[in-house]
């Protein structure tokens, strides 16, 4: 019974990932695309967690942590880009 529930949960999360891919393509704004990309990262983490429980292995939990860190960094970078128009600010003044 638990395996059937896990499979159904994986299917539901996969369908929601497809909806987020549509949001990335259609937009309409950059903020929508950023949020959809972040949501895909969370959904991917959920899929890996469900699969890890399904196969009874804790080794995939490291992958979940890595994806979470990368999703956070990506969202932070995109947010800074939206706010300032660039990611890396350079100080062009030379102090002698």
Curated annotation (Swiss-Prot):
May form a heterooligomeric complex that consists of seven subunits: mnhA1, mnhB1, mnhC1, mnhD1, mnhE1, mnhF1 and mnhG1. It is a multi-pass membrane protein. GO terms for molecular function: sodium:proton antiporter activity. Mnh complex is a Na(+)/H(+) antiporter involved in Na(+) excretion. Belongs to the CPA3 antiporters (TC 2.A.63) subunit F family. The keyword Iron does not apply. It comes from Staphylococcus haemolyticus (strain JCSC1435). The chain crosses the membrane at residues 2-22, 30-50, 53-73. Keywords: Antiport, Cell membrane, Hydrogen ion transport, Ion transport, Membrane, Sodium, Sodium transport, Transmembrane, Transmembrane helix, Transport. It holds the Pfam family MrpF_PhaF. PANTHER family: NA(+)/H(+) ANTIPORTER SUBUNIT F1 (PTHR34702), NA(+)_H(+) ANTIPORTER SUBUNIT F (PTHR34702:SF1). This is Na(+)/H(+) antiporter subunit F1. It is found in: Cell membrane. GO terms for cellular component: plasma membrane. Its main location: membrane.
């Amino acid at each position: 019974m638990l395996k059937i529930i896990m499979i159904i949960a994986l299917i539901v999360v996969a369908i929601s990932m497809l909806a987020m891919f549509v949001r990335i393509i259609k937009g309409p704004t950059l903020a929508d695309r950023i949020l959809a990309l972040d949501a895909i990262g969370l959904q991917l983490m959920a899929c890996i967690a469900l699969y890890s429980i399904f196969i009874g292995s804790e080794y995939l939990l490291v992958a979940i942590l890595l994806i979470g860190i990368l999703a956070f960094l990506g969202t932070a970078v995109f947010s800074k880009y939206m706010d300032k128009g660039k990611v890396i600010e350079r100080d062009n003044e030379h102090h002698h």
